């Protein structure tokens, strides 16, 4: 997907106080009464909220073209909140709203527009508090304590739709076909859009739009909708409403070798692990109503790679606009929203959103940073900074310029993990510590978990979140992941080091002082293939030496004192392409057998079977050294997959996270795995 910068909306305000788009010379909503127009056209036109009471599933999914001021979304949110308050035990428990916006509004303009509707203020305030940066792609916002999911896709809807993942097929219960009038914005109202709407609509799904233009009606009908004219709002004579026939056929998966199956049973899910990925996955599943059990091999959570005192949080950028960059930029913004939400829920952990500075300390690092900055990033995400600027930001002179991440910072992974699990337990999570799963055996009803001394346990669905120990269980032993030992040094602060105000990244990292223990963290060693966790003096010294080597002209690094031998070692799990593995556990032997002629089948357009995987066995792993950045979005992706929901990412990103990706890439090229 293109990484072209997103242009924000340019507004003027007419005599009625209605916002007008300068790009399209059209109002965002009716001068007469925008709120009532929304209720009439989009809610009543889709028989909402009356359909909520009869909805047979826990989730109702709405998609919209043209988010604008968010009026349609806020109005629907209000209606859903009223429904939930009066009918708390209904089958329907959550609302998922998907919307596209080519020119997102600035927060200040949103606030001015929202001031028109005081009754929507509680919802509008919460929306603006999470309003994302203008970055292309999907921004998932979790609102109303998780009952509302908002996917904001920034970019041109017709450019985004071809990159959508098949998880959207036959999902949408109601379409809000909105946007500026066809006469003002003809590029949006295309046959491609109408076809995608039909492809994504659930059989029996509805649509409504304010326009009655003939080419729109014909285009929707040609795409497969049954469309009729209805009385328009106010002085408008007509509008269109419609439905996709209940017998609409299923949509074929365009890339079956990347199929992401849902779980057959979400009422009984076991997670094997005890780190940050386990904690956040448990919360994502519980939010959806799952029953979840955690099995941790250690006496308490966060004894492994998630047990450090301070970990840096910042995006991984490269300037290439590839899946790696797209994932980590989206993951970083989602992580900040999630961590802020957890803090508001009472999940405490040491942290400072103090910013992160990455140094151009040599020719190679300067080249990498130059590539990153070739992209026009929002300045709140990443910005170039010369030596003087970085020195002012960091409070200490490094001797170099580089790139600054204003919304980055550090947090305590151990406290985050343990306290997030405590919150999950309050929400119903069952935890079993010192429960080391030694074997997984498929049964007719799911999976049998075997331990050394405990009785076996049965669960319908299992998630592997056991870090570098993935290879110890037979179904996942073939996954191409590897262990990386890392030792982090804990050093006492000094008057000079205490001046450091941001996380400093070079060929290593140094954190600001943690006021609660008067120590910094400096690290980390990188020993591929090693799983031993004993203290090593040579790695302790190397952590210090790398700082001195990268900042040779500065005197303050010499104050770093590692002589106390205070350190912690963890073992990460990583992949060659630096991306996590999120999804169903692939069956290695079945993949080789079933796809031995995949290249030829694909080239000839032959039917290709779905990717073979172990039923109801999933993995979230290989988070490497950036688990604090990737774990929240990874957990959300996996939970959405298990529940068969739309996923927060485009097809290229999701393909790059699929656990079978490395095998399939080779097989598609006719190469041996």
UniProtKB/Swiss-Prot annotation:
GO cellular component terms listed in the entry, alphabetical order: cytoplasm
This protein's UniProt keywords: Cytoplasm, FAD, Flavoprotein, Methyltransferase, Multifunctional enzyme, Oxidoreductase, S-adenosyl-L-methionine, Transferase, tRNA processing
Reactions that this protein is recorded to catalyse: 5-aminomethyl-2-thiouridine(34) in tRNA + S-adenosyl-L-methionine = 5-methylaminomethyl-2-thiouridine(34) in tRNA + S-adenosyl-L-homocysteine + H(+)
Region annotation FAD-dependent cmnm(5)s(2)U34 oxidoreductase: where it falls in the sequence: 272-673
Location of the protein in the cell: Cytoplasm
Cofactor(s) needed by this chain: FAD
GO biological process: one example: methylation
Molecular-function GO term, any one: flavin adenine dinucleotide binding
Entry EC number(s): 2.1.1.61, 1.5.-.-
Region (tRNA (mnm(5)s(2)U34)-methyltransferase): 1-245
Function per UniProt: Catalyzes the last two steps in the biosynthesis of 5-methylaminomethyl-2-thiouridine (mnm(5)s(2)U) at the wobble position (U34) in tRNA. Catalyzes the FAD-dependent demodification of cmnm(5)s(2)U34 to nm(5)s(2)U34, followed by the transfer of a methyl group from S-adenosyl-L-methionine to nm(5)s(2)U34, to form mnm(5)s(2)U34.
NCBIfam families cross-referenced by the UniProt entry: MnmC_Cterm (TIGR03197), PRK01747.1-1 (NF002480), PRK01747.1-2 (NF002481), PRK01747.1-3 (NF002482), PRK01747.1-5 (NF002484), tRNA_MNMC2 (NF033855)
UniProt family annotation: In the N-terminal section; belongs to the methyltransferase superfamily. tRNA (mnm(5)s(2)U34)-methyltransferase family. In the C-terminal section; belongs to the DAO family.
Protein name per its UniProtKB record: tRNA 5-methylaminomethyl-2-thiouridine biosynthesis bifunctional protein MnmC
Organism: Serratia proteamaculans (strain 568)
């Amino acid at each position: 997907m293109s990484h072209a910068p997103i242009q924000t909306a340019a507004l003027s305000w007419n005599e009625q106080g209605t916002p007008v788009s300068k790009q399209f010379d059209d109002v965002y909503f009716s001068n007469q009464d925008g709120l009532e127009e929304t209720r009439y056209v989009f809610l009543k036109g889709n028989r909402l909220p009356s359909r909520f009471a009869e909805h047979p599933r826990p989730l109702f999914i709405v998609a919209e073209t043209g988010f604008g001021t968010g009026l349609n979304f806020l109005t629907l949110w209000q209606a859903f909140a009223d429904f939930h308050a009066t009918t708390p035990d209904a089958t329907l428990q959550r609302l998922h709203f998907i919307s596209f916006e080519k020119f997102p509004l600035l927060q200040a303009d949103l606030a001015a527009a929202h001031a028109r509707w005081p009754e929507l203020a509680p919802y509008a305030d919460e929306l603006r508090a999470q309003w994302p940066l203008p970055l292309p792609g999907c921004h998932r916002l979790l609102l109303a304590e998780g009952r509302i999911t908002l996917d904001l896709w920034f970019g041109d809807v017709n450019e985004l739709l071809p990159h959508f993942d098949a998880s959207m097929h036959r999902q949408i219960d109601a379409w809000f076909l909105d946007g500026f009038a066809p006469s003002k914005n003809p590029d949006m109202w295309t046959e491609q859009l109408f076809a995608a709407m039909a492809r994504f609509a659930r059989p029996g799904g509805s649509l409504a739009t304010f326009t009655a233009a003939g080419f729109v009606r014909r285009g929707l009908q040609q795409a497969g909708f049954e469309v009729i004219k209805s009385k328009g709002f106010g002085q408008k004579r007509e509008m269109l409403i419609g439905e996709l026939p209940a017998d609409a056929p299923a949509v074929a998966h365009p890339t079956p070798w990347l199929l992401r199956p849902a779980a057959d049973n979400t009422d009984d899910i076991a997670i094997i692990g005890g780190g940050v990925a386990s904690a956040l996955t448990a919360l994502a599943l519980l939010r959806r109503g799952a029953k979840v059990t955690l099995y941790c091999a250690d006496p308490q959570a966060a004894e492994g790679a998630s047990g450090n005192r301070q970990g840096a949080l910042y995006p991984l950028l490269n300037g290439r606009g590839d899946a790696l960059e797209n994932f980590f930029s989206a993951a970083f913004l989602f992580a900040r929203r999630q961590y802020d939400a957890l803090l508001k829920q009472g999940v405490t952990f040491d942290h400072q959103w103090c910013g992160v500075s990455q140094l151009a300390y040599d020719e190679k690092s300067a080249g990498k940073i130059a590539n990153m900055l070739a992209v026009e990033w929002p300045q709140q995400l990443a910005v170039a900074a010369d030596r003087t600027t970085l020195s002012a930001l960091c409070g200490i002179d490094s001797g170099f310029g580089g790139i600054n991440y204003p919304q980055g910072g550090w947090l305590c992974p151990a406290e985050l993990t343990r306290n997030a699990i405590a919150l999950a337990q309050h929400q119903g999570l069952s935890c079993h510590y010192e429960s080391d799963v030694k074997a997984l055996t498929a049964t007719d009803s799911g999976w049998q978990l075997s331990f050394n001394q405990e009785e076996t346990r049965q669960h319908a669905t299992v998630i592997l979140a056991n870090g570098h120990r993935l290879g110890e269980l037979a179904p996942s032993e073939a996954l191409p992941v590897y262990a990386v030992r890392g030792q982090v040094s804990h050093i006492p602060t000094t008057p000079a080091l205490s001046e450091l105000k941001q996380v400093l990244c070079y060929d290593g990292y140094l954190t600001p002082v943690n006021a609660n223990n008067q120590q910094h963290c400096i690290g980390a060693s990188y020993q591929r293939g090693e799983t031993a966790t004993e203290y090593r003096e040579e790695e302790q010294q190397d952590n210090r030496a790398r700082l001195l080597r990268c900042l040779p002209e500065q005197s303050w690094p010499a104050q770093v004192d590692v002589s106390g031998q205070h350190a912690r070692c963890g073992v990460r799990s990583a992949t060659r392409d630096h991306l996590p593995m999120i999804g169903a556990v692939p069956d290695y032997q079945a993949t080789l057998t079933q796809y031995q002629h995949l290249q030829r089948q694909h080239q000839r357009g032959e039917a290709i079977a779905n990717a073979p995987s172990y039923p109801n066995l999933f993995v979230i792993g290989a988070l490497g050294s950036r688990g604090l950045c990737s774990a929240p979005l990874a957990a959300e992706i996996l939970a959405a997959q298990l529940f068969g929901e739309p996923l927060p990412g485009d097809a290229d990103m999701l393909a790059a996270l699929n656990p079978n990706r490395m095998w399939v890439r080779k097989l598609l090229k006719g190469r041996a795995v």
